[in-house]
């Protein structure tokens, strides 16, 4: 499985309990980008929409804010993303789908994971591992309870420095051994040299 499938695998697991949805979810993003050039302009995407749409179909292309927005819209559900490094929480679809299900992800700077809440003894739930909360049915205290647990986990991971600061981390090109700082230098090095194998040190 490709490392850069994490966002798609996390969304697939949260909403479908499947790790086999990445290709399908990538196609959803591809189609959305091509169908709405006003929303998904080159300025918003960082590259021309057609190029971005083709790029996102590749299994080694990562997902981020654009994909979370598109998938929230497509699924008509909320997606809460908890950023370990900053403590920020972005809830995609909260304003558009306030009475929908909400799935939870945690992000460490490089990797998205599904958040699964274990609630043994829940009534009328055969599986006690909960991946979504239904914002239309659940009391606000339960919704807030999920949020508190997710924030607490992100805070704990932050205190343990279980995140990668992609703007400032030290990398070495494993092809030519050049030292680099941050994702931007690595991207520029890859563009000018064709080298794409990096290691953090």
Model-flagged regions — what are they?
Residues 171-176:
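Short cysteine-rich clusters marking metal-coordination/redox-active sites
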Residues 66-168, 181:
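Deubiquitinase catalytic domains
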Residues 1-2, 114-117, 198:
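Generic detector of short, aliphatic-rich beta-strand segments that form the cores of beta-sheets
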Residues 165-169, 182-201:
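C-terminal recognition-helix end and immediately following basic linker
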Residues 12, 179-182:
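Secreted/processed peptides and extracellular or luminal domains of membrane proteins
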Residues 3-4, 10-93:
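Papain-like cysteine protease catalytic cores
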């Amino acid at each position: 499985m490709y490392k850069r499938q994490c966002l798609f695998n996390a969304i697939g697991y949260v909403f479908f309990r499947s790790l086999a949805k990445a290709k399908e979810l990538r196609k959803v993003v591809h189609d959305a980008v091509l169908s709405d050039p006003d929303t998904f302009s080159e300025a918003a995407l960082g590259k021309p929409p057609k190029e971005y749409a083709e790029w996102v179909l590749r299994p080694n292309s990562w997902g981020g804010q654009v994909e979370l927005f598109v998938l929230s819209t497509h699924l008509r559900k909320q997606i809460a993303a908890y950023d370990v490094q900053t403590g920020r929480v972005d809830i995609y679809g909260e304003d558009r789908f306030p009475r929908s299900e909400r799935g939870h992800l945690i992000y460490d700077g490089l990797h998205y994971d599904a958040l699964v809440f274990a609630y043994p003894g829940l009534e009328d739930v055969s599986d006690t591992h909960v991946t979504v909360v239904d914002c239309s049915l659940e009391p606000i205290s339960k919704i807030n309870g999920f949020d508190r647990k997710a924030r607490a986990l992100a805070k704990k991971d932050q205190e343990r420095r279980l995140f990668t600061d992609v703007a400032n981390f030290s990398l070495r090109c494993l092809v030519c051994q050049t030292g680099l700082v941050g994702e931007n230098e690595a991207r520029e090095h890859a563009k000018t040299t064709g080298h794409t194998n990096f290691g953090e040190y």
